[in-house]
């Protein structure tokens, strides 16, 4: 994409990717539009942003998140769009500050069919939000994932098992606790929700991790903590403490809240707020119409009304105008998509040359 007011924010082949991305981010941070959005968020106004082409949205989102800090929740129109956005954000913020919060199900909560990888990613994102400190984090999600209510942060805090090197606890006590949380004993762990014991070694696969933990005991004391690879069984990282998180989806419905209620004072970035609200109510209507126990199922999921209530007074940035929550401020970024060249590289060369004569820089 090209920015009319300054250099083009178009990424092509680069010699030094990291330094080039830093330069692009620094240029974006100096634009008046980015500064306006930061000011709007700090003053807690609902802001509509326009004229953001291609990856410009991810670029400016990363700039604003870095400036304002905290937790930023980006709601895309669908799963694929959320995943693509997360991929763009990795380039600007780094993978450790970008999370993907999917649904727990392969298709829909209406059909069941739990998605194991989705449960792990979802739990990891929720844990990152609950334990957030320091630099901003950005969580990418979509309506079907927002539809499922989650265990309240207070209930999670009472459930998560935290173990540190040097802790005085027996393997038997730890075994009893994790079984109460629904973990299953196996010979060798290979997926979240499993644990194994042999000699003084206690392996366990938390639902918030993509690799299992290995706890080495000396008597009733935790001597060491490590992550390890499933395929080789070799340690990859030594740790000072670990959090063992169960499958939060299995908790009683009365302990659950909407994701908007769970995240608290986050900044919400909505691709299309009215579309999201319509999807929430449509999914809820279908679920309850097919449910054998509608009273219980109603507690498992959210609604448009609940989402609007839980985000009332929260900071929100809209990519499209909303009838349900009109913007108080509008900010235009004036970026343009790159021209379609359809493999006619002479056209690309001519365009780059013309832009250079106008004072643009090509990345």
Name these PLM-found stretches.
Residues 2-363:
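ASCE RecA-like P-loop NTPase motor cores
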């Amino acid at each position: 994409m090209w920015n009319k007011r300054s250099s083009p924010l178009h990424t092509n082949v680069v010699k030094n990717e990291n330094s080039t991305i830093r330069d692009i981010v620094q240029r974006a941070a100096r634009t008046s539009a980015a500064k306006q959005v930061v000011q709007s968020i700090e003053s807690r106004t609902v802001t509509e942003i326009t004229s953001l082409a291609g990856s410009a949205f991810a670029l400016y989102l990363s700039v604003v998140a870095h400036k304002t800090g905290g937790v930023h929740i980006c709601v895309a129109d669908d799963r694929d769009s959320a995943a693509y956005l997360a991929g763009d954000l990795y380039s600007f913020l780094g993978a450790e500050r970008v999370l993907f919060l999917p649904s727990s199900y392969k298709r829909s909560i209406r059909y069941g069919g739990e998605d194991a990888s989705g449960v792990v990613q979802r739990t990891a994102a929720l844990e990152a939000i609950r334990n957030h400190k320091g630099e901003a984090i950005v969580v990418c999600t979509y309506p079907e994932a927002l539809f499922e209510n989650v265990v309240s942060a207070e209930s999670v805090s009472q459930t998560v098992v935290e173990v540190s090197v040097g802790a005085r606890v027996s393997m038997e006590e730890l075994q009893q606790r994790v079984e109460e949380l629904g973990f299953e004993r196996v010979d060798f762990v290979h997926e979240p929700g499993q644990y194994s014991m042999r000699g003084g070694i206690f392996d366990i696969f938390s639902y918030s991790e993509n690799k299992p933990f290995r706890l080495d005991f000396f008597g009733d004391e935790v001597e060491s903590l490590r992550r390890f690879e499933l395929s080789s069984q070799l340690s990859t990282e030594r740790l000072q403490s670990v959090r063992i998180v169960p499958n939060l989806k299995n908790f009683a419905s009365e302990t659950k809240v909407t994701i908007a209620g769970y995240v608290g004072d986050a900044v919400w970035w909505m691709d299309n707020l009215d579309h999201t609200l319509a999807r929430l109510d449509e999914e809820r209507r279908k679920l309850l119409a097919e449910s054998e126990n509608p009273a219980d199922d109603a507690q498992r999921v959210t609604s448009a009304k609940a989402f609007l209530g839980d985000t009332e007074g929260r900071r929100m940035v809209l990519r499209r105008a909303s009838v349900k929550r009109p913007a108080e401020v509008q900010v235009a970024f004036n970026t343009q998509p790159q021209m379609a060249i359809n493999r006619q590289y002479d056209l690309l060369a001519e365009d780059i040359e013309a832009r250079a004569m106008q004072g643009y820089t090509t990345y």
